[in-house]
Amino acid sequence: MIAFSTCWNSGRHNAGDKMLREIKGKLGFELIELGHGIRISLMPGIQKMFDAGEVRFSSLHNFCPLPVEVMAASPDCYQFSAVYPQERERAIKQTFQTIDFAARLSAPFVVLHLGAVNMKPITDPLIELAKAGKYLSRKYVRLKLSAVQKREKNGAIYVQRVKDCLRRVIDYAASKNVKLGLENRRGYEEIPTERELPSLLDEMNSPQIGYWHDFGHAQIKENLAFLDHAEWLRAIAPRTVGCHVQDCIWPAQDHQPPFAGGVDLEKLVPLLPSNCLFVWEMSPRKTTDEIRRSIQLWKERFGE
């Protein structure tokens, strides 16, 4: 089953019903994910469309709606991994609100970002080196290895904070019959890494959570030599509940329409469970025609 995320058009609409009708009318999607750029002002129109039976929702991407003090899409504005307990508490309460909206709109999933380790950024510097023709140069490898050592040394306390927050969020989601998708992240600094995620799922030990695979993020990590995309997906596929579908132009230009970049969808998609939810997450810069062509190719290869 395929759905479409409002991250493509929420920024250019002031009315939620018009935003949803653009996706339905121009792209033909009946099933929609409310992305992390949904302002509170869009909610009345969204609720109106839902109440009229004109739209169904696959999922909500935390935080949805945006906290009132945040003006633009910002899924990492509050983090479960934060040093200060006040920020962690704010992240939890905002996530509860997202879960409440998901329950109200009969959306079965909420997609979560979990936070990051406080360390010198490494992902973007590696991307810049790759773009400058220095991929896997001595400088590149030295920077990468140093970052891995620091991440492994310092990450545990941040991951523990995430676990403490997640337990509360899982309990709340269970009370609302909403499932949580823990998304793989673009940046090596972010939580969880692919090494951390299986044990995180094991420790939480809840049917309420599963893995949410972002094709673009995983491809960026493969392009930067952090993982093998197919090997990772093959290992985690049985625990995957949904995914964000997008392509990626080397090394890190993601949110492209499928079949426009270097993601080997023909090899990767069949690895996923038959009941996996596929949510298209497109850049606002992609045109309707580009997306339509991609949808047609997808349906020819993988069906509806």
Where are these regions (language model features)?
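Short, basic/glycine-rich phosphate-binding loops at helix/coil junctions
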Residues: 74-75, 140-146, 244-249
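A short beta-strand-loop structural module common to alpha/beta enzyme folds
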Residues: 30-39
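Short acidic/His/Gly/Ser-rich catalytic and metal-binding motifs that mark active-site loops
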Residues: 66-73, 119-122, 252
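Short hydrophobic interaction/assembly module
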Residues: 51-75
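Short glycine-enriched loops at secondary-structure junctions
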Residues: 7-11, 61-68, 115-117
